[in-house]
Amino acid sequence: MDSALQEQGSMFQSAGDNSMKIWKMISFAILSLVSLGIIFIFEIKDWPAGSSIAGIVLGFSLPAFWHSIQDLSDTTNWKVSQRKLRRGRFISNETIIRISFAYLYRIKVGNKYLLVKNERGTKKYQPVGGVYKLKGNEKIELKNLYHIKDDNKVSIDESSCNDYRLRIESKYLRKFVKRFDKKAERERVDDLSREFMEELIEKGIVNWDQITYRFCGRHMTNLYFGKHFQIYELLLADIVELLPTVEQENDLRQLMTQHSDLYHFATAEEIISLGVNTETGELEELIGDHTKKTIQEYEGQLMKTRDFGKTYTVELHT
């Protein structure tokens, strides 16, 4: 399959991309009109060979014109990848897509990032954070609107039954994402305290009453076939950066001097290599591969949504 359809960070389409799409649409429109004109003239002149050639050209240009109109609505790379998969008949409108929408914290002190152990699954170290939670009657609304199904790849219990890990038919995916951004009753970026408290406060790693963080942007994969779960997937991760006070930064530096299996500090290079060090012979992956989405080196690849750059202060209550 085209490598462009594999899992990659997705950005809004640039102005240059949109200009190219517009020029393609105009070009195919002109070519189609010219072909129609030639067919009309040649039919009047009773020159069947000329009208036949123009008909062949029209058979190419008219579908291309329609495709170019469709392409204008593909404003992000994940939409482009979905369109390519449809046109290539890799997926249909009824193809089930697995979605996982999450938020992740960048907690950096000096040149190292604070990671916590994934105790439920891989046991690898990863950023503080997790999947968004549905609230109120949102899950019922999503069932009524888009016939969503529970994720069948990760076990569901009382703590995960309202997670934004779901399955949905491809034809509903765009409306689903639009609702997630605008109308959905769910956890919002102005209060992402829940996972912070569960993974750092309740475990006694830090003891803070309040935090401030900045919204860095959104990482969104292309629509791709996940080898691990053997299903087409769309993954979203909103990235926020902790803005520690002087006292909180001192607490983090103190943590760096202590050893614990609950957390780990890693440099950007260690995160990119997943903790593998060929020089020392440490070949086991210690760090989750999604962790790199949070490091500063990747911030330029994040989508700048409407919350980009905003800061939020939240109280931490256990």
Label each residue range with its predicted role.
Residues 2-318:
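N-terminal leader/linker segments that precede catalytic domains of diphosphate-processing enzymes
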